[in-house]
């Protein structure tokens, strides 16, 4: 790469895209990498502020920004995603399906700490749709040493930075608990909320029963729901420390492994998550899920539908960003709620 005066560059080959920005109108390349500069191009180049310009000179120790962007893309890519066209030295990764985006934060930080290169991603554990942008990659200068890119590649030698886990068509069960519903003192308004949220993922409810505050009956119901083919079991209500609330005990008595009873998220502190020996999640949902627009359930549900096991450590990490502000206009998931680590 060689720097020379634009007015002297006729016949030379551009080594990078030249961008023109007109506020509110366009931000795009007026000339692409590889373009041979003509006399007529000089006024255009000067009008976009290019009094001096880089032209291409072969150097086997260096990589052009487009080549480097391809390497960065390769370090990120995984199944169910594809690249955009390279543009102005940048490649973006696009989702091929609906699913859960996972980001290896340690690898991402290591690569971005090397300098002269960058990878920007969406938040990990984010629900994305087919066609959504997942990440963007580029180097900062126009050229970069091959050796430096090889160092970056070594960071990802045991796996890429991104994973996109497709959602699965789940069959789920709802066990409505509480004397107040069982004895028809109040209407069950919880189950429709669960159905609506699961419908977003194409899931089908195959089992629904209502129980009084009897732990043994709820335990038996969980087992029968799984025998009926439920991939996910949701127990609604009965999650507080009141003496009549038996759901946590009932879930424990199924023999399932309790991951966490309680989560640093509001709304949703009394949330319970357990897994059976064969990996079926049993979830205890507190009453806030019924009346609050967004809760802990919205943070965990996409992971359950994608068969992405949730750990106690991950739930503990939700504390920073775990406070929903109940905004008048809800923009979730495009907000800070649930973005803790």
Where are these regions (language model features)?
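Short glycine/threonine-rich loop/turn motifs
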Residues: 179, 206-338
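Solvent-exposed alpha-helices and their adjacent loops that cap or buttress functional pockets
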Residues: 7-11, 29, 83-86, 126-128, ...
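Glycine-rich phosphate/diphosphate-binding loop of Rossmann-like nucleotide-binding domains
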Residues: 158-213, 217
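C-terminal terminal segments
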Residues: 29, 85, 100-118, 126-129, ...
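Short, low-complexity N-terminal leaders and the immediately following helix N-cap/first helix
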Residues: 1-88
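Flexible, glycine/charged-enriched surface loops at secondary-structure junctions
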Residues: 55-56, 81-86, 144-147, 204-208, ...
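Extended, charged alpha/beta regions that create polyanion-binding interfaces
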Residues: 59-167
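Residue-level recognition of short, solvent-exposed, well-ordered loop/turn junctions
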Residues: 32, 38, 123, 127-130, ...
């Amino acid at each position: 790469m060689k720097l020379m005066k634009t007015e002297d560059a006729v016949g030379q080959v551009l080594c990078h895209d030249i961008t023109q920005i007109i506020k509110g109108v366009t931000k795009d390349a007026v000339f692409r990498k590889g373009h041979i500069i003509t006399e007529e191009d000089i006024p255009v180049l000067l009008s976009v502020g290019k009094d001096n310009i880089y032209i291409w000179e072969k150097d086997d120790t260096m990589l052009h920004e487009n080549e480097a962007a391809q390497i960065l893309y390769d370090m990120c890519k995984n199944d169910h995603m594809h690249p955009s066209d390279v543009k102005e030295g940048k490649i973006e990764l696009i989702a091929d399906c609906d699913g859960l985006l996972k980001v290896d934060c340690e690898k991402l930080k290591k690569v971005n700490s090397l300098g002269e290169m960058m990878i920007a991603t969406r938040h990990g554990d984010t629900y994305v749709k087919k066609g959504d942008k997942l990440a963007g990659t580029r180097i900062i200068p126009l050229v970069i040493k091959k050796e430096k890119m090889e160092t970056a590649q070594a960071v990802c030698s045991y796996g890429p930075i991104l994973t996109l886990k497709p959602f699965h068509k789940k069959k789920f069960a709802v066990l409505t608990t509480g004397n107040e519903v069982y004895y028809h003192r109040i209407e069950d308004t919880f189950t429709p909320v669960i159905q609506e949220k699961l419908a977003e993922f194409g899931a089908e409810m195959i089992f629904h029963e209502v129980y009084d505050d009897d732990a043994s009956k709820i335990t038996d119901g969980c087992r029968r729901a799984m025998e009926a083919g439920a991939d996910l079991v949701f127990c609604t209500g009965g999650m507080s420390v009141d003496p009549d609330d038996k759901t946590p005990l009932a879930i424990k008595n199924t023999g399932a492994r309790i991951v966490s009873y309680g989560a640093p998220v509001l709304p949703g502190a009394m949330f319970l998550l357990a897994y059976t020996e064969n990996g079926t999640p049993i979830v205890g949902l507190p009453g806030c899920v019924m009346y609050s627009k967004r809760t802990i359930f919205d943070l965990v549900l996409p992971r359950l539908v994608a068969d992405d096991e949730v750990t106690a450590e991950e739930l503990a990490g939700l504390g920073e960003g775990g406070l929903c502000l109940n905004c008048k206009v809800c923009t979730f998931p495009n907000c800070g709620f649930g973005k803790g680590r």
